[in-house]
């Protein structure tokens, strides 16, 4: 009977802008997420008095977190990944002094987790930044934003140094290439050069946060967070294989800088070939040497790559412009399901970096419907998660050091890509629909009891 290590962290992951609601309460400022009502790929819509969006209330975690944490504890969670809303701490982003009410909220949240023996894993910036920094400074396009972020990071490290020992800098930092407003606060019309300069500023800020964390909380560990976009060649044609190498490097580059402390040679060539000249100072190069302690990543799907331009044209428009894999089934949202790919990715990252790995997002979004007894019989989710966890166990057997697993959306939340509540991920059902109707009542799905057993048996209950 194969089991997971005794110190393996089990839990779930959420993001402030997808669960908290209370979008202007207690001094919170507007974030980029607040002005993207249709999700990370949607247009920017300036807020006006009296308007509303689904994320303004979301699932009201801001007021209901004690109830939700109690349910997480009932499942046996040893870890909960949350994010701090930067705009609760520095509403506009450029203030000299933080907002005490925002700091106090996260004190209460972390205290509640501690009361249930749940370790917090805290993301500093999860798909949001102060809208004030975008409007007044140009987001991450401005070098000044590095300083604003470092002030924010140092503020929360100092405040929560006794309460939080596991940190992440930027969520899915490589998504800036696909969603520049969400990632770096730049308009969709930005040039490749502008986006990479903003990414450079963010990489420097991430490294400065790592350095600050090590100074302020010596016993803490801080990691990066990548969207694990593993690609396969569509065929064994050498052109497809080379194209796949390049596609994988497009996201691995972020990890290379954050884990190795310098820009890799292949990116230098890419910048030369693309006519991109980054402004990189000696101080930047020195800062980048502060590397992360571990690598965290999300994993939802794999895709295929081909050098055949006609096939590539057909793939335009799906989330990462991937060519479908003919050997895999897809979710309702067209995301291809590939449990073995998770084992492969874990091995790829371990071979590349030799640093501990943490799977901090993995899950199945589906249109759950309660049955006559009000229970969601989500066998499809159980099957999806079971098959992925079996592959995590195999990777651990391969010798990969895996710190833990936090499923995405242990409770239904507003999805990032299209800001839908109908795309449900949770073990816990939340009574609210895409129009904002519902009581917000929480109820346990079938998967709630399944995950509880998996955690209690350290994975022994998984079906091979």
Residue ranges of each PLM-predicted region?
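Active-site region of glycoside hydrolase catalytic domains
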Residues: 1-49, 92-94, 103-464
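Active-site mouth loops of central-metabolism enzymes
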Residues: 50-64, 141-144
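Catalytic domains of carbohydrate-active enzymes, especially glycoside hydrolases
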Residues: 60, 64-85, 290, 294
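Aromatic-lined carbohydrate-binding/catalytic grooves of carbohydrate-active enzymes
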Residues: 75-102, 122
């Amino acid at each position: 009977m194969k089991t997971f290590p005794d110190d393996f962290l089990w839990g779930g992951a959420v993001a402030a802008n997808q669960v908290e609601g209370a979008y202007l309460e207690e001094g919170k400022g507007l974030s980029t997420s607040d002005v993207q009502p249709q999700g990370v790929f949607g247009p920017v819509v300036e807020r006006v008095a009296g308007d509303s969006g689904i994320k303004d209330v979301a699932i009201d975690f801001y007021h209901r977190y004690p109830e939700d944490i109690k349910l997480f504890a009932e499942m046996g969670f040893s870890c909960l990944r949350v994010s701090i809303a930067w705009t609760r701490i520095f509403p506009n982003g450029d203030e000299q002094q933080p907002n005490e009410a925002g700091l106090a909220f996260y004190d209460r949240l972390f205290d509640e987790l501690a009361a249930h023996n749940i370790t917090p894993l805290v993301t500093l910036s999860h798909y949001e930044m102060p809208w004030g920094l975008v409007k007044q400074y140009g987001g991450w396009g401005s070098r000044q934003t590095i300083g604003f972020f470092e002030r924010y990071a140092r503020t929360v490290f100092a405040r929560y140094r006794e309460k939080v020992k596991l940190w992440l800098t930027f969520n899915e930092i490589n998504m800036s290439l696909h969603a520049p407003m969400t990632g770096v606060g730049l308009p969709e019309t930005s040039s490749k050069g502008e986006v990479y300069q903003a990414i450079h500023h963010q990489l420097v800020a991430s490294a400065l946060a790592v350095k600050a964390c090590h100074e302020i909380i010596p016993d803490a560990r801080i990691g990066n967070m990548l969207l694990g976009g593993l690609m396969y060649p569509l065929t064994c044609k050498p052109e497809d294989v080379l194209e796949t190498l390049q596609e994988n490097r497009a996201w691995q580059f972020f990890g290379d800088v954050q884990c190795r402390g310098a820009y890799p040679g292949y990116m230098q060539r890419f910048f030369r070939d693309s006519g991109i000249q980054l402004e990189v100072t000696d101080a930047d190069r020195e800062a980048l040497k502060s590397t992360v302690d571990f690598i965290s990543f999300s994993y939802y799907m794999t895709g295929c790559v081909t050098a055949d331009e006609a096939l590539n044209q057909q793939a335009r428009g799906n989330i990462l412009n991937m060519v479908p894999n003919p050997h895999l089934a897809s979710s309702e949202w067209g995301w291809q399901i590939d449990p073995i790919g998770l084992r492969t990715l874990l091995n790829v990252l371990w071979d590349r970096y030799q640093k501990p790995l943490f799977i901090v997002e993995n899950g199945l979004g589906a249109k759950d419907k309660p049955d006559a007894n009000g229970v969601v019989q989500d066998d499809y989710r159980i099957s999806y998660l079971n098959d992925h966890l079996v592959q995590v166990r195999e990777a651990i057997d391969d010798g990969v050091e895996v710190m833990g697993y936090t499923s995405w959306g242990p409770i239904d939340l507003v999805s990032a890509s299209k800001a839908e509540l109908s795309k449900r991920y949770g073990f816990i059902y939340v009574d609210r629909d895409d129009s904002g109707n519902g009581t917000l009542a929480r109820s346990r799905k079938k998967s709630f009891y399944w995950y509880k057993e998996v955690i209690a048996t350290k994975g022994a209950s998984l079906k091979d």
